[in-house]
Amino acid sequence: MKLPKTIGLVHFIGIGGIGMSGIAEVLHNLGHKVQGSDQADSANVQRLRDKGIEVFVGHRAENLGEAEVVVVSTAIKKSNPELIAAREKLLPVVRRAEMLAELMRFRNAIAIGGTHGKTTTTSLVATLLEAGGLDPTVINGGIINAYGTNARMGEGEWMVVEADESDGTFLKLPADVAVITNIDPEHLDHYGNFDAVRAAFRQFVENVPFYGFGVMCLDHPEVQSLVGRIEDRKIITYGENPQADVRFKNVRIDGTRSIFDVEIRRRRTGQVIELKGLVMPMPGRHNISNATAAIAVANRLGISSADIAKGLASFGGVKRRFTLTGEWNGVQIFDDYGHHPVEIKAVLRAARESCKGRVIAVHQPHRFSRLASLFEEFAACFNDADSIFLAPVYAAGEDPIEGIDSVSLVSRIKSGGHRDARFLTSAEFLPQMVAEVAKPGDFVVLLGAGSITSWAAALPKQLEGLSGKSV
């Protein structure tokens, strides 16, 4: 039985969330009646309103109105007044992943999983499928610059979704194609231990039907190990590894562009397809790896090499993924969502390869628990930055942990041999600190999942305001 058009008004609690908003938008585009609520106004909320979706600010029982179905994310607490009211009315309460799974049943589905790189890879797969004329429906975990939104309603038979592993619900998604970019010990508050994370990703691939396939990164040791344990499913490997079925090589970085070749080898026939001189307007080996995953999917779906090259060259990127927010005095300023040591290291390596001058990193750690569990990894992930400014931890509702703060992290980074790590007491001092050290040709990269994105947006004008003043 498929999702009927007669389910009535669907109410989303927390509709402004990046995962919830995309599902709400696609449901609305399919002709369902949709409304929702969120704690605060936001760009996502306004975007949904512009499409005719009613959104209430604040959570109150009366917001449900005539709703017949309620959708919630795992972030919504049992004490939420709207959730309490829904259960009192005996309304069906649907988890975000369950509703996403229902939408996926209408299409052949590609689910992009992994602890890092999901959003960019989802966007790249969508871009290549669009270039190949497949007109996909897309639900992503970030704003795709070409769409100005995180969702796209297509007329084709394929759907591309980001599969969020954080709460285990990605295992509910009925994917025909499953992509795994990497596997790191994340979300242990939910899983309990790393073995449980490994088991979840194995099940994610093995859930694919016999006529589907998995696409797995051979450069990541955990994923390579998993490849050897998958039985009775077709697997396509990718990466820089010479043993990969779809391999990238001959990488050249030209400013903020990546130029590379890809070799596709068919195991059964021995056929080799070469894609030479591919251009992607985004730097970094991690992004080339993500692009190679997308190429593996696109090639398998029959998209021509010419369309793959055309789509890749047109890729407009994802909001908050090495996004240029402005320039000042020959200094380029970038905003990036990176908040895990693996992500930070990859972004700064890309900046180092692209930059003619020095790299200045500004980081706002996200959550005390993450900083505590990965303290040594954070201390070692900034080596490609010439200067580091560390802001206070963005708590995200957590209580402080004694001895775990940015001052301690600065001290640990310095003791590890870094020449210039400093504590940034608050955002108001950032323009002055940047102006004192930045020179023409330098990159300033602001990284984090908290409020730092607003600093990145404001910094170019703030620096202009300092021009003419003594610094």
Swiss-Prot record:
Q: Where does ATP bind?
A: G114, T115, H116, G117, K118, T119, T120
Tell me the route in metabolism or biology where this protein functions. Cell wall biogenesis; peptidoglycan biosynthesis
Q: Which domain of life is it from?
A: Bacteria
Q: Where in the cell is it found?
A: Cytoplasm
**What cystine pairs are annotated?**
none
Q: Which InterPro entries match?
A: Mur-like_cat_sf, Mur_ligase_C, Mur_ligase_C_dom_sf, Mur_ligase_cen, Mur_ligase_N, MurCDEF_pg_biosynth, UDP-N-AcMur_Ala_ligase_MurC
Q: Which reaction does it catalyse?
A: UDP-N-acetyl-alpha-D-muramate + L-alanine + ATP = UDP-N-acetyl-alpha-D-muramoyl-L-alanine + ADP + phosphate + H(+)
Task: Tell me its EC number(s), please.
Answer: 6.3.2.8
| GO-annotated cellular components | cytoplasm
Keywords for this entry? ATP-binding, Cell cycle, Cell division, Cell shape, Cell wall biogenesis/degradation, Cytoplasm, Ligase, Nucleotide-binding, Peptidoglycan synthesis
Which EC class does it fall in? ligase
GO molecular function terms here? Answer: ATP binding; UDP-N-acetylmuramate-L-alanine ligase activity
One GO BP on record is: cell division
Q: What does this protein do?
A: Cell wall formation.
Q: Which HAMAP family match?
A: MurC
Q: Which family does it belong to?
A: Belongs to the MurCDEF family.
What protein name applies here?
Answer: UDP-N-acetylmuramate--L-alanine ligase
Q: Which organism is it from?
A: Rhizobium johnstonii (strain DSM 114642 / LMG 32736 / 3841) (Rhizobium leguminosarum bv. viciae)
Q: Which gene produces this protein? A: murC
